[in-house]
Regions:
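NTP-handling and nucleic-acid-processing catalytic cores
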Residues: 2-120, 186-189
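A glycine-biased structural micro-motif
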Residues: 49, 53-58, 129-139, 147
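The substrate-binding groove and active-site-proximal loops of carbohydrate-active enzymes
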Residues: 91-93, 125-134
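Phosphate/diphosphate-binding loops
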Residues: 133-161
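Short cysteine/histidine-rich zinc-coordinating motifs and their immediately flanking basic loops
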Residues: 158, 176-180
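Short cysteine-rich clusters marking metal-coordination/redox-active sites
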Residues: 164
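Short Cys/His-rich metal-coordination motifs, predominantly Zn2+-binding knuckles/fingers
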Residues: 167
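Cys/His-rich microdomains that often coordinate metals
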Residues: 171
Length: 189
């Protein structure tokens, strides 16, 4: 979901796949080698460098959005085998507060937990979209990136998405701090 782009604290590549830095005109791009032709059809390009995913691990990057200062090291490349080369660039953004794969990578790399969506599902005051339901800012985020010249592509993907069975509103994966009591340790026999 585009709304999680502004919550991303890392990028993730597949550790064993091949990635390339290519030059197209005056611009350079890093993406999975297997996806170059898909992303640059009928385009002349020069391969400047080749990498295995692990070569990119811990390389730092400049975030697209930086509404808060994370309390831990952020904005670097991580590796995980869940990243596939079926579409996109072979590089995914990681927002540990939104999604099981992202949360797992976040724990593995000790990434900061950035939560800019409140308990009602609305963007918080740190963002320009304060008070707006997070799914309603998807288009605005893409427009913002395009206006700044930072949107490479935004293809429409058809995939299943969870909706509330009662009111038909989109559901969001929302991680929050919780605690549990192991009652078997405190219960009298």
């Amino acid at each position: 979901s585009p709304f999680t782009i502004n919550l991303a604290v890392a990028l993730c590549v597949n550790p064993v796949e091949t990635y390339v830095k290519i030059k197209v005109g005056d611009e350079k791009f890093i993406l999975a080698e297997a996806l170059v032709e898909t992303n640059f059809p009928d385009t002349e390009y020069e391969v400047v460098e080749k990498y295995v995913g692990t070569d990119l691990e811990y390389k730092e990057y400049e975030p697209l959005f930086n509404f808060v200062t994370p309390d831990k090291k952020a904005y670097y490349v991580t590796c995980d085998s869940y990243v596939t080369l079926t579409d996109g660039t072979g590089i995914v953004h990681i927002a540990p507060a939104f999604g099981e794969d992202d949360a797992n990578v976040g724990r593995k790399y000790n990434l900061p937990f950035v939560q800019l969506v409140d308990g009602k599902g609305e963007m918080t005051k740190e963002t320009p979209w304060a008070g707006t339901f997070c799914k309603d800012v998807d288009k605005e985020i893409l427009v913002n990136l395009e206006e700044r010249g930072q949107l490479f592509n935004a293809p429409k993907f058809e995939h299943s998405y969870p909706f509330c069975w009662r009111c038909d509103t989109p559901l969001i994966y929302y991680a929050r701090d919780t605690w549990f009591i192991k009652m078997t340790d405190v219960k009298d026999d």
